[in-house]
């Protein structure tokens, strides 16, 4: 099987935790089943560059990070169990802002 191509996007400050890059195209190992849970672990190991505690809490995103998959709230799609499909767009939006 070919690589699984997905797009990651970061907005509203979430990009600051990922080297200030707002959009990434990823090619993941297509022989593996990729869920959001697996993706978050991969992101932590490979591209999360600043203060992981502001993005992750345990095995999931921390409260205050909205996750949209193809413009749909991940809560409607099974959250961590959602199985990524080719050309999925996964958007992380931070609602955590200093005052």
Curated annotation (Swiss-Prot):
InterPro entries, per the entry: Beta-grasp_dom_sf, Mopterin_synth/thiamin_S_b, Urm1
Record's comment on post-translational modification: C-terminal thiocarboxylation occurs in 2 steps, it is first acyl-adenylated (-COAMP) via the hesA/moeB/thiF part of the MOCS3 homolog, then thiocarboxylated (-COSH) via the rhodanese domain of the MOCS3 homolog.
Modified residues (1-thioglycine): 99
Pathway: tRNA modification; 5-methoxycarbonylmethyl-2-thiouridine-tRNA biosynthesis
Subcellular location: Cytoplasm
SUPFAM superfamilies hit by this protein: MoaD/ThiS (SSF54285)
Cellular component GO terms held in the UniProt record: cytosol
Chief location: cytoplasm
GO-annotated biological processes: negative regulation of JNK cascade; protein urmylation; tRNA thio-modification; tRNA wobble uridine modification
Cited Pfam families: Urm1
Keywords from the UniProt entry: Cytoplasm, Isopeptide bond, tRNA processing, Ubl conjugation pathway
Glycyl lysine isopeptide (Gly-Lys) (interchain with K-? in acceptor proteins) crosslink, residue number(s): 99
Keyword Transmembrane helix: no
HAMAP family the record matches: Urm1
Protein family: Belongs to the URM1 family.
The protein's role, per its UniProt record: Acts as a sulfur carrier required for 2-thiolation of mcm(5)S(2)U at tRNA wobble positions of cytosolic tRNA(Lys), tRNA(Glu) and tRNA(Gln). Serves as sulfur donor in tRNA 2-thiolation reaction by being thiocarboxylated (-COSH) at its C-terminus by MOCS3. The sulfur is then transferred to tRNA to form 2-thiolation of mcm(5)S(2)U. Also acts as a ubiquitin-like protein (UBL) that is covalently conjugated via an isopeptide bond to lysine residues of target proteins such as Prx2/Jafrac1, Ciao1, Eip71CD and GILT1.
Subunit structure: Interacts with cer.
Protein's name according to its UniProt entry: Ubiquitin-related modifier 1 homolog
Source species: Drosophila persimilis
């Amino acid at each position: 099987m070919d690589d699984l191509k997905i797009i990651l996007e970061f907005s509203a400050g979430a990009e600051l935790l990922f080297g200030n890059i707002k959009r990434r195209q990823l090619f993941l190992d297509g022989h593996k089943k990729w869920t959001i849970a697996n993706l978050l672990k991969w992101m932590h190991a490979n591209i999360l560059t600043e203060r992981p505690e502001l993005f992750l809490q345990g095995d999931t995103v921390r409260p205050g990070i909205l996750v949209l998959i193809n413009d749909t709230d991940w809560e409607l799609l099974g959250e961590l169990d959602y199985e990524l499909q080719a050309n999925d767009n996964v958007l992380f939006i931070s609602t955590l802002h200093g005052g």
